[in-house]
Amino acid sequence: MFDNFLIHTFHDGNCLQAYKIFGAHFETHEGKKGVRFTTYAPNARSAQVVGEFNQWGETPCYMERYNNGGIYTIFVEGVKEFDMYKFRFETPQGDIIDKADPYAYFSELRPGTASKVYNMEGYRWHDSKWIKNRTKNYDCPLNIYEASLGSWKMKRESEGEGDDGEYYSYEELIDEIIPYVKKMGYTHLEVMPLTEFPFDGSWGYQCTGFYSATSRYGQPKQLMKFIDACHQEGIGVIMDFVPAHFVKDSHGLHMYDGGFVYDYNDYNRRYSPWDSVYFDLGKNEVRSFLLSSVEFFATYYHIDGFRFDAVSNLIYYEGNKNLGENIGAMEWMKRLNGHMSGYHPTVMMIAEDSTDYPGVTKPVGEHGLGFDYKWDLGWMNDTLKYFQEDPVYRQYDSHFITFSMAYFYSERFLLEFSHDEVVHGKATIINKMWGLHGDKLAQVKALYVYMMLH
């Protein structure tokens, strides 16, 4: 029924394909077609699967313990693709709670919170030439366009596109964003997180479904088609990935089975400044959960690179050096980068890290964290400060544009102007520049040339 080697590596914190064990999978059991549901809930007294196929529990479907390792499973006959479901647990305290499947491939459109049965197999890719020639771009131009697929452009009723504010679908974006990215000379499109998230305003940085491409823009195979189209136009796709924390919404990972499966047992370590919950990456099963998520998107969606959000919070507890190194999370990063360099050697691994921790892009074998690139956040902040100043006073602050060279060769850096610098009223790049509009235009031109030639 299950691959015992995968189960062993799952509990050992080294599993790259935990999604083959857990979640909802079509199978034929004793001549009957249906779906096998499996979940990891070590603290639950009992577990059920509830959904459209059993009237949300009116006909109970109690799951069986597979072993003593906290795994529950059940085969349910007659379940169809797109059927909605959840797992129902009796907690150690005797409460009954319903949870979305952490390993679900597809989710109900918000504000709904159920998981959906989905068949990931069958999409025919047309990007074999792209994949064959793909590299990590160490010795060729790398020009990345960062965008949220939801906020980049929305439909307008006045133009006959749909309701005002309605999102474009993955397929519709093929004819919208890809021509723009290509025309502007970008080599890669970096999409802000696509893993399922409940609140539009988070832009995807507070996730619930780490295997579920958000249903806001369509179905998983439509996302595959979008990425396939990017590749056929010579555009790589980088995906923002959020390994540090997750939302505390009641249907999600927080206190998944009534206990702390994914979160810290220690209250003082548990909650983040973003009103979310930190992953406890000292737990092997959590390591396997996130390792497998990255591998899943690389395999099934042909993602060309991952930009890892808030790496400083993985290096130090809460991103604070005074709180000490987050040993569990750093071990996870080393395992991740080591595994990915072996199994997906041309996929870029990019750290968004604001610390001065050494060796972020040094190979794991040389006692580094193993990333391919690190965002140079210090360069971005210093450069923008310099260009905001009146030119009369810049002679006194030349260190803003020279200091970066003092550390530039210590890591393999990417220079960036990210969404963090233009949100919450911080102004667009052009409006950060000194002077009147004509002055600002000239400054922006100088800024981008400086960035390219740095």
Specify the residue positions occupied by each region the protein language model found:
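Short proline/glycine-enriched turn/loop motifs at strand-loop junctions of beta-rich domains
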Residues: 40-47
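Conserved alpha/beta catalytic core and glycan-binding cleft of carbohydrate-active enzymes
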Residues: 111, 304, 316-454
